[in-house]
Amino acid sequence: AYKAIYQGGLTIKSTQNLQIQKICDEEVADKANYDAGTKYSFYLSFQVKEKDGTIKTYTNQTMLSYYKKKNKSQNYSINFTSEEDCRAAIAQYEKDVLGKGDKLVENSEYIFITMQPQVAMTIMDQSTGEVQAIVGGRGNKAGNRTWNRATKTCRQPGSTFKIIACYAPALDAGGKTLASVQDDAPLTVGNKTYNNYTHKFGGFTSIRKAITKSINIVTVKTLQDIGVDLGYEYAENFGFSTLTDTDRNLGISLGGLTQGVTNLELTAAYAR
């Protein structure tokens, strides 16, 4: 392969659109886009060799627990206003947990500081499915093959999943049309009570209106009509790799999933 690249005329093409990628990078980096202001958090890991030779590992999670217990308060946070404040807090924690005769294990310390809030973005050509731009998070890359929030982080898709797991199968194979009507009224199934975001109900409502207004009750009742298995099957066929059998329930129509989905796969589903 090495010779083919440099001597054999092998050509490697990328789907990336540099102009679109530049716009995405600039917008993600623009602090004016974040109303709450930028905070900094971190992942921390280090080891301490205690006086008796015991090795203990400390992390950002043990740090949270330590100060919540010490301060007798659940309000302690590892979100700070600057990277310098993060490093100062880490240094103080290391000082606090080191007892007399204890030593920090050489080369055991790992600190990765990230900006908050974080962000992920995927831009895809709907006609070809080609990824034209992708953003895996805010901040400077700390190295190659680092964590990419667009391709690896799973989040709850919420109402974006209504089309995927309910209305697409309902219109395509479930015998429904945009003019089909459901009664938008209080709904309890088993021990689960469903509600709308507004906590109001509109009576008989078309699927067309339910989509434009993102009405939960109509969505759940539509999935009841066509069957959960059909909705789950369509979601699988849209290419979601993180679905599990525990997602075979009415909650899938509202995007309530066990693991969630990635930004990349959600974008790809809408580009199909």
Regions found by a protein language model. Give the residues of each.
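Short, charged, amphipathic alpha-helices and their helix-cap/turn boundaries
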Residues: 226-243
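Active-site-proximal helix/loop microenvironment
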Residues: 241-272
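Flexible glycine/proline-enriched surface loops and loop-helix/loop-strand junctions
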Residues: 5-10, 146-152, 194, 203-204, ...
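Extracytoplasmic/secreted proteins, especially bacterial periplasmic and envelope-associated proteins
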Residues: 11, 19, 23-26, 165, ...
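Active-site SXXK
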Residues: 24, 128-129, 155-182, 210, ...
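Conserved catalytic neighborhood of penicillin-recognizing serine enzymes
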Residues: 175-231
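Penicillin-binding protein/beta-lactamase superfamily catalytic region
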Residues: 2, 224, 255-259
